[in-house]
Amino acid sequence: MAMANLARRKGYSLLSSETLRYSFSLRSRAFASGSDENDVVIIGGGPGGYVAAIKAAQLGFKTTCIEKRGALGGTCLNVGCIPSKALLHSSHMYHEAKHSFANHGVKVSNVEIDLAAMMGQKDKAVSNLTRGIEGLFKKNKVTYVKGYGKFVSPSEISVDTIEGENTVVKGKHIIIATGSDVKSLPGVTIDEKKIVSSTGALALSEIPKKLVVIGAGYIGLEMGSVWGRIGSEVTVVEFASEIVPTMDAEIRKQFQRSLEKQGMKFKLKTKVVGVDTSGDGVKLTVEPSAGGEQTIIEADVVLVSAGRTPFTSGLNLDKIGVETDKLGRILVNERFSTNVSGVYAIGDVIPGPMLAHKAEEDGVACVEYLAGKVGHVDYDKVPGVVYTNPEVASVGKTEEQVKETGVEYRVGKFPFMANSRAKAIDNAEGLVKIIAEKETDKILGVHIMAPNAGELIHEAAIALQYDASSEDIARVCHAHPTMSEAIKEAAMATYDKPIHI
């Protein structure tokens, strides 16, 4: 019912009950036939792929998922989102013990980092979660094939298994969910020792005295924070004139100041033009992005974090004629169909935010379409989070984007310095910023900088998804004392006046 209501509000039409019955009867006959052919085959077992596989099985499809890594969860779970959050939390605990415990009357001395134990905790979390997904596959009767798949035809996938065998998996519907890979930089060769990708940065055996991060995006700032908290001198080199270019400008400025207070150094409007790894460390030659005098930056380790690129290598897309754009992204329609009948794509390999949760939503929506249901993902309302301390989270448009539309708008802000819970825990850095259309009060964007912004942002995400106004949020009773009261106060500031400032 909720999906039906949302579809009507958004202007989408639901399929008729006759169409749904026909769709389900087709699936039931295919599933019961005992055929070797699958209803759905997914290439890739990351967030998009494994979620699509489970949902497809739940909808009654005979489903197989092919994953080359040998462990489910993709980049996110194995060498991305999850291990980085484990290290962010561990490094934050160390930093708090050294710098904040005393403020709360907790006296500690000789606080040390056991890097091996820290890495062990991270690895344990990853292992537990990958095994958990395998358990979900068994529970939902998803066939799991470990190996590298490539198209033989639009309905056949040749798989070189990790056991060294070859098998062909057939499917009526093939979903490409192969994710993305690290984007390389010309002249900078990643060896995962001195020059590392995010994968290597998650597994360093020693704390580098000097770490240079190339790229001031989400991943670079998070990994820079991990190593900076436990002793590294961190310098971030960024080609653009600002960090995290997609972030609201006002929030970005405060965020950069916060990181600088923590010791992170920034060289903006700077490009890397040379790399020398002949000595014990690395010497980077840099110059202004527009050209100019060159300087040398020395480091023990260099992290290349210049973005990601769709991973479609070896899939034989050319053989079956799947179209891609100039960035290598697979082109799909609103139902995630490619130009080749029976072949679909989701997640990082298609246009849209390269985020794990976006890929998951793609996966669910795609298989719902296959089942005759309504599936939809609004990429303008996908939340994003930088998991530093403080965290920065946002959903919807930035103030700069709203200005470009020409729509008249209002802005309401509320600082955590005026929030009782934030003051009580002695962690009151940051603010909530809400942007709403002036005429209708409809919320257009919400931006939060706070210790737990990633958790707070979802109230705003729901509001945007259902076209709520700032007054709608302001009139919801929020528990006291909580950090979420800052959202209520910012909403009050947007359409009227806040109480506590």
Swiss-Prot record:
Main location: mitochondrion
Gene3D superfamilies, per database record: 3.30.390.30, FAD/NAD(P)-binding domain
Active site: H480
Residues annotated for NAD(+) binding in this entry: G215, A216, G217, Y218, I219, G220, L221, E222, E238, V272, G307
Pfam families: Pyr_redox_2, Pyr_redox_dim
Cystine pairs: C76-C81
EC number from the UniProt entry: 1.8.1.4
Any coiled-coil regions, as ranges: none
GO molecular function terms noted in the UniProt entry: dihydrolipoyl dehydrogenase (NADH) activity; flavin adenine dinucleotide binding
Cofactor(s) this protein requires: FAD
Record key words, sorted: Disulfide bond, FAD, Flavoprotein, Mitochondrion, NAD, Oxidoreductase, Redox-active center, Transit peptide
Reactions this protein catalyses: N(6)-[(R)-dihydrolipoyl]-L-lysyl-[protein] + NAD(+) = N(6)-[(R)-lipoyl]-L-lysyl-[protein] + NADH + H(+)
A single BP term in Gene Ontology: 2-oxoglutarate metabolic process
Cofactor note: Binds 1 FAD per subunit.
Family, per entry: Belongs to the class-I pyridine nucleotide-disulfide oxidoreductase family.
Record note on quaternary structure: Homodimer.
Note in the entry: The active site is a redox-active disulfide bond.
Function: Lipoamide dehydrogenase is a component of the glycine cleavage system as well as of the alpha-ketoacid dehydrogenase complexes. The pyruvate dehydrogenase complex contains multiple copies of three enzymatic components: pyruvate dehydrogenase (E1), dihydrolipoamide acetyltransferase (E2) and lipoamide dehydrogenase (E3).
Protein name: Dihydrolipoyl dehydrogenase, mitochondrial
Native source organism of the sequence: Pisum sativum
UniProt gene name: LPD
